[in-house]
Amino acid sequence: IYLDVDIIVLDDLSELYRLNIDDKYIAGIRAAGYYYPEKHAQNTMNILDIDSMEYYVNAGVLLINLQNMRRDNLEEAFNQLICKKYPSMDQDILNKVCYGKIRILHPRYNAMTKYKLLDDNSYKNNKALQIAYSIREWDSARKHPVIIHYADKIKPWEDVEMEYAYEWWRAAALLPFFSDIYRQYIKNGQMKKINVQLNEENRRI
């Protein structure tokens, strides 16, 4: 299992790890933002020279079949493309090289804050989500996420009031170097917001 650094795991990953990808290279969730508008989707297909966006996945959370990758020498294919300037860098390269051998995961394994997880109208107001997921999938993902992915320009260590910032700070408070993080926020004038967040945490424990 590969996880980006800007994620929080909220539940057991054993079910994800046990998923069958014997005939695949990777498994991930559909990268909804690349599915719409159609012009953007077509442009990605042209750049990567692929026939469909149906299996284009976000690279932030991946289940990887290393055995198949080594068997088919995918490292060489990656090395050949790594010097090219793809718009989404590693994500584009992974989708290009692994095309045809990608399994789609349920979006609860990579619930991205940029899609407004706490907004009841997020699905209705986002055409990309409607193309990538069913309403049932999306509701399940945002209400019962296994992994929260802060896949946006704003991160919880920059804005303690963003969606699911509470979960990130709760995890950060357990780290041995949390005092360093806290001191940095004091320097940035964020101490009041952090105190409010931590006091809220104390009330919930």
Short names for language-model regions:
Residues 24-48, 162-170, 178-181, 197:
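A short, conserved beta-to-alpha structural element at the edge of catalytic cores
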Residues 59, 64-205:
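A glycosyltransferase accessory/donor-loop signature
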Residues 1-38, 56, 63-64:
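GT-A fold catalytic core of metal-dependent nucleotide-sugar glycosyltransferases
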Residues 45-52, 133-136:
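Short, P/G- and charge-enriched loop/turn segments at secondary-structure junctions
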Residues 49-61:
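A recurrent flexible, glycine/aromatic-enriched loop bordering the glycosyltransferase active site
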Residues 22-29, 34-41, 52-54, 78-91, ...:
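Glycine- and acidic-residue-rich phosphate-binding/metal-coordinating active-site segment common to enzymes
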